[in-house]
Amino acid sequence: MIRCNALIRFWDEYLQSPSVPDASLNGLQVQGPQEVNKVVFGVSASLALFEKARQAGADLICVHHGLLWGQPERLTGLLGERVRFLMNHQLGLAAYHLPLDKHPHTGHNACLMRALHGQNVRPFGTYHGVDIGFAGEIEPAALAEVVSTLEAFCHTSARVLAFGPKTIRTVGVVSGGAYSMLPQAISEHLDAYITGSLDEPAQEWCREGNINGISLGHYHSEKCGVEALARLTAEKCGIATEFIDIENPL
């Protein structure tokens, strides 16, 4: 068991959350029990996740995509129903968005870079003045081999825009819906850019920029950091944790 405020303080300090500007209201978003015995982790807040967390006996839910995004909102509609469920079932909710994207050990992008055995890894992917991804070198490998490694790691099927070098030596990684950072990868002459979702402009950017684009899906590109945080929390805080997968093809 751990006090809820002590657990939030641990996450805040480990992820350096207060120092990261973000639209997400990172930290505790909905108050639950003061004492936490079990935390359920998931990628995104939803009623489906909340119900599974209740069934799993959780006291607190921790997600990457929370409910509150820095703007005054009425507790009506979908938001109202989600908050009502949490309150009725005495479930707390915490969220960590950009702090989990950018963390050099536990973040999604660090995990993806490790899956490729990245070397000389450096911050990359500037978003509102904050580098939230990583770029680095990998052992030279065919594009198909890189894609296969990522698909196995993320348990997904990738979408590939093969317009760059056939042998990959340098990569940039920014998980989630980060197709707009593709021009940054082009300007740094990287061989491949890895993200969650690539939107319509990405095809011609890749063609004209001589770069390979690899899309893993927004959801699947951001499971690994949440899973890593769950493992770390169990190890450091001595409480039960469980990652719940609400499958999402997008």
Residue ranges and their predicted role:
Residues 1-250:
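Active-site catalytic microenvironments in core metabolic enzymes, especially phosphate/sugar-handling
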